[in-house]
């Protein structure tokens, strides 16, 4: 690692010795990683290696699965997100999520963005709400395409537009971290390029952690990359270093397509 690793204020998320089980099956094994603020971190690895499971540990989405048990530290601002008494709703406001397939609410474009800030009492006046919706849609690169049809259903948009609407929905509450679980896997190449450009812009204000199976995408968008294999994090480094000179044979084989 090359980035001021000992400077705590650069950290957004600190993970130490994280283990997770689905019943008797251990899905994550002793994961330790520092995720830096205002960067894009890509999680790569074969299907079933633990990438998405790890991602969901960062906002406790795994808590929704009855058979899950977790040990280890996931820390934000010095607070363990798994600590007893942690407000999960408040945590998920700070750690937004964008899923693999666009999933807009069955509401208008406007309401898709306005709903969460209103539920969190972030706005009271209609004018403030309008301003917040416009800001989120602008930040998601969608405003000019929807400003004249804000009260049409979010589901009326194209797939790529729906995914940007979901990003606008996530950033409307101004989270610290945005989790993206293969956010472009269901999109066409043009929409994919738009989302990738957006990720580069959004990292100025947010920390982004993304799961991807696309090595080229990881190389294009990520500042740091972590390679997972069979529940273990095999290697974590600056993306340029990882892709030009990986330190492990497993990472090299996966990145170069020789895996398996």
Curated annotation (Swiss-Prot):
ABC transporter domain residues: 13-255
SUPFAM superfamilies cross-referenced by the UniProt entry: P-loop containing nucleoside triphosphate hydrolases (SSF52540)
InterPro entries attached to this UniProt entry: AAA+_ATPase, ABC_transporter-like_ATP-bd, ABC_transporter-like_CS, P-loop_NTPase, PstB-like
Self-association state and partner proteins as the record states: The complex is composed of two ATP-binding proteins (PstB), two transmembrane proteins (PstC and PstA) and a solute-binding protein (PstS).
Residues binding ATP, per UniProt: 45-52
Cellular component, GO, one term: plasma membrane
Function in brief: Part of the ABC transporter complex PstSACB involved in phosphate import. Responsible for energy coupling to the transport system.
Catalytic activity: phosphate(out) + ATP + H2O = ADP + 2 phosphate(in) + H(+)
Principal place of residence: membrane
Biological process, per Gene Ontology: phosphate ion transmembrane transport
Origin species: Chromohalobacter salexigens (strain ATCC BAA-138 / DSM 3043 / CIP 106854 / NCIMB 13768 / 1H11)
Membrane topology: Peripheral membrane protein
Catalytic activity, EC: 7.3.2.1
Keywords: ATP-binding, Cell inner membrane, Cell membrane, Membrane, Nucleotide-binding, Phosphate transport, Translocase, Transport
The protein, known as: Phosphate import ATP-binding protein PstB 1
Location relative to the cell: Cell inner membrane
EC class of the enzyme, as a word: translocase
């Amino acid at each position: 690692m090359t980035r001021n690793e000992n400077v705590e204020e650069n950290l957004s998320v600190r993970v130490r010795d994280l283990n997770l089980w689905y019943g008797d099956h251990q899905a994550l094994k002793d994961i330790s990683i520092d995720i830096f603020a205002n960067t894009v971190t890509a999680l790569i690895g074969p299907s079933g290696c633990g990438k998405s499971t790890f991602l969901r540990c960062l906002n406790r989405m795994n808590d929704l699965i009855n058979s899950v048990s977790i040990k280890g530290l996931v820390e934000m601002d010095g607070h363990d997100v798994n600590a007893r008494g942690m407000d999960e709703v408040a945590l998920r406001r700070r750690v937004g999520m964008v899923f693999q397939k666009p999933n807009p609410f069955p509401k208008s474009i406007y309401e898709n963005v306005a709903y969460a800030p209103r539920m969190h009492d972030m706005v009271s006046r209609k004018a403030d709400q309008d301003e917040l919706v416009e800001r989120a849609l602008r930040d998601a690169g969608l405003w000019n395409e929807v400003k004249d049809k804000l009260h049409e259903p979010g589901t009326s948009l194209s797939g790529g537009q729906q995914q940007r609407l979901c990003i606008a929905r996530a950033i409307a509450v101004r989270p610290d971290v945005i989790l993206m679980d293969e956010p472009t896997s269901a999109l066409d190449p043009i929409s994919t390029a738009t989302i990738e450009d957006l990720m580069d812009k959004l990292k100025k204000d947010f920390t982004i952690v993304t799961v991807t199976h696309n090595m080229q995408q990881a190389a294009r968008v990520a500042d740091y990359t972590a390679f997972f294999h069979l529940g273990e994090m095999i290697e974590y480094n600056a993306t340029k270093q990882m892709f030009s000179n990986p330190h492990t044979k497993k990472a090299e084989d996966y990145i170069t397509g020789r895996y398996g």
